[in-house]
Curated annotation (Swiss-Prot):
Protein name as catalogued: Glycerol-3-phosphate acyltransferase
GO cellular component, one term: plasma membrane
Any Pfam family the entry gives: G3P_acyltransf
Role this protein plays: Catalyzes the transfer of an acyl group from acyl-phosphate (acyl-PO(4)) to glycerol-3-phosphate (G3P) to form lysophosphatidic acid (LPA). This enzyme utilizes acyl-phosphate as fatty acyl donor, but not acyl-CoA or acyl-ACP.
Record-annotated membrane-spanning stretches: 10-30, 60-80, 86-106, 116-136, 166-186
Length: 201
């Protein structure tokens, strides 16, 4: 049996590994490489895929979405070689790294893509629940932000109902953070001023 000190050091190491991987600002890197300047200077100032889409480059936005998700998936899967607790720590680290990347003043994205990526790495069936909830909400409301909020709310409930308390607790915490990061969107949803999917301007 591993010593408690070693176990704790392993978890801290996994958390740091996840954070470093998650803090790679792909949205910023890709837009600069494409000659589109600093994505933080347009739209919401966010480095995530939604704001990258405001550059008008759909392929770049899709690439940002995929890479931001893969950060979470890779962190969880690599750390899983050292056990589920290490995978959970690394996944959470990647999520936090995306939200608060040290390289750009701790101002990152809103975390939805990385949330999904971590979910794929830790409980792929939960990712299907997320996708289904997102699609249904999007079809009914046409609000991308609301779809993400509903999907992230459903995930910990689904995980808990399947008897996975550890993952349910992790994603409950991550869901709370996603809601906090979307507080401006929530205000606009309540005011009826949030942009709908496909809306111009």
């Amino acid at each position: 049996m591993a010593e408690p000190g070693f176990f704790n050091a392993m978890l801290i190491g996994a958390l740091i590994f996840g954070y470093v991987l998650g803090s790679i600002p792909f949205g910023l890197i890709l837009t600069r490489l494409a000659g589109l300047g600093d994505v933080r200077a347009i739209g919401s100032g966010n480095i995530g895929a939604t704001n990258v889409l405001r550059t008008g480059n759909k392929k770049l936005a899709a690439a940002t979405l995929i890479l931001d998700a893969l950060k979470g998936t890779a962190a969880a899967l690599i750390a899983a070689h050292f056990g589920q607790n290490a995978a959970i720590a690394a996944g959470f680290g990647a999520f936090i790294g995306h939200l608060f990347p040290v390289w750009i003043g701790f101002k990152g994205g809103k975390g939805v893509a990385t949330y999904l990526g971590v979910l794929i790495g830790l409980a792929w069936a939960g990712a299907l629940v997320f996708a289904a909830a997102w699609i249904v909400t999007a079809l009914l409301t046409r609000y991308s932000s609301l779809s993400a909020l509903v999907a992230s709310l459903v995930v910990p409930i689904a995980l808990y109902s399947r008897g996975n308390q550890a993952l349910a607790a992790l994603f409950a915490i991550m869901t709370v953070i996603v809601f906090i990061k979307h507080r401006a969107n929530i205000r606009r949803l309540l005011n009826g001023t949030e942009s709908k999917i496909g809306a111009k301007g």
